[in-house]
């Protein structure tokens, strides 16, 4: 199975991302429900501009993070580590992403928080269900996939 396809299928079944940003040597992490766009290889999240992580991100920033399940046994561990870029969406781009997000999470219709995109540039997917320590790597810029 193609690496990005396997990663995308797994990410589509999850819903919480943890991401971290840094500003002037200070690190901060946050969690949010996400919508995964397999075509753009990006997460869409909602977060208020007044939050510490949004203020540290500004309009655009480097980001790293994880998505993982909570299995009770090592043999079932699956998870993603990533790096990329976070940016606040504006205009039509924001509206399209919000509509898709609201379809996935209808309760979000009541929120006015801005929509942000986390573009994934590097993904490492660990899937112990395929064998202990099995890792798949995807890189945006090189088109490289490693199993």
UniProtKB/Swiss-Prot annotation:
SUPFAM superfamilies: FMN-binding split barrel (SSF50475). Signal peptide: none annotated. Transmembrane segments: none annotated. InterPro entries: Split_barrel_FMN-bd, UPF0306. Belongs to the UPF0306 family. This is UPF0306 protein YhbP. It comes from Escherichia coli (strain SMS-3-5 / SECEC).
């Amino acid at each position: 199975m193609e690496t990005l396809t396997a990663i995308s299928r797994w990410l589509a079944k999850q819903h919480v991302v943890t991401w971290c940003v840094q500003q002037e040597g200070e690190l901060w992490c946050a969690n949010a429900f996400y919508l995964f766009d397999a075509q753009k290889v990006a997460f869409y999240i909602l977060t208020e501009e007044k939050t510490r992580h949004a203020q540290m991100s500004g309009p655009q920033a480097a980001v790293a993070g994880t998505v993982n399940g909570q299995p009770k046994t090592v043999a079932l561990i699956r998870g993603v580590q990533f790096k990329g870029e976070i940016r606040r969406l504006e205009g039509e781009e924001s509206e399209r992403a919000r509509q898709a997000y609201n379809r996935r999470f209808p309760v979000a219709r009541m929120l006015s928080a801005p929509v942000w995109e986390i573009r994934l540039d590097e993904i490492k997917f660990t899937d112990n269900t395929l064998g202990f320590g099995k890792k798949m790597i995807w890189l945006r810029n090189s088109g490289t996939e490693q199993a």
